[in-house]
Structure formats: C-alpha cells, structure tokens
Amino acid sequence: AHTKVLDTQGKYTWIKAPRYDGKPLQVGPLANIVVNYAKKNERVVKVVDQFLKDAGLPLEAVFSTLGRTACRMIEAKVVADNGLIALENLIANIKSGDTQTCAKYVIDNSKEYKGRYIGHVPRGALSHWCRIEKGVIKNWQAVVPSTWNATPKDKDGAMGAYESCL
C-alpha cells in the first residue's frame, strides 16, 4: 500500500481557513455580544451596561479573559430572556388553536437532495452542507466555530482569532 507522508517542510495546516470577504473572523459569545452592542440591540446593551456598572469596568474590559467569560454569561442571559418571549408566543398560539408542531414529508430515494444550515450555536457560527443521492449521503461538509477561530495566518499575514488574542 502506498502511504503519503505529510510534507512538514511545505505549506500545510491542520484546520480549514475560512474567510469572509477575504478576512478572518472571530465567532462566539464575545463577537456576538460586541456586534449586538455596536448595533445598539437594546436587550444586549442593557445587560452589558449593567454588568460593566456592577463590576466597575469600562467597555474595553470585554476584550479580556474576564470579558470573554462575561460575554458567555451575558449571551446566556439574553438567550434565556428571549426564550421566555418564545414560550409566551407558543402559549398564545396554543390558546388560539394553533397546535401544529411539524410538517411531515417523505424522502423520495430516487431523487437528489441538497441542503444547508447556517446559524448560531453557543460557540459561534456553524454551517453544514449535505448532498444526498438515492438515499445515501454523498457529501457532508461543516464549518464549525473552531474552524473560524483557529484559522491559521494567511498569505497576507492576517491571523485568526486564537492567534491574534495571544
């Protein structure tokens, strides 16, 4: 059997190198909270400002180990608060007679299907792409939060989030 050995002298990386508009991005709670704060999302601004006031810290403190940890908690609070709103909407739907919970469908194994998911999970941006042929998965691709944050330095010297924060 032919075995190919990794050429450690050449250029290689142990993780994908995604870019958005040619630039590396940071994803996750810190990025999510900072973007929402900058966009003046009222729910986020209220919780961030209260945290900073209670801790006696300036806004710049979110760009620290403490800030990263706080952003995880802040995001959890914002998500929980939004969950209460979703629960209230669900109860209102049920009371009005809307009890449908899913749309049933049948997969035709003679067809080809393509799908994708692009969304947000606790660690950050997540995307999946899938292609199914004759009931068999032919291709599955994922770009997970660590892929964005651990991306290596590129040819232009732009570092990923992990490298740049170290």
Can you say where each PLM-predicted feature lies in the sequence?
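Metal/cofactor-centered catalytic core regions of large enzymes
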Residues: A1-L166
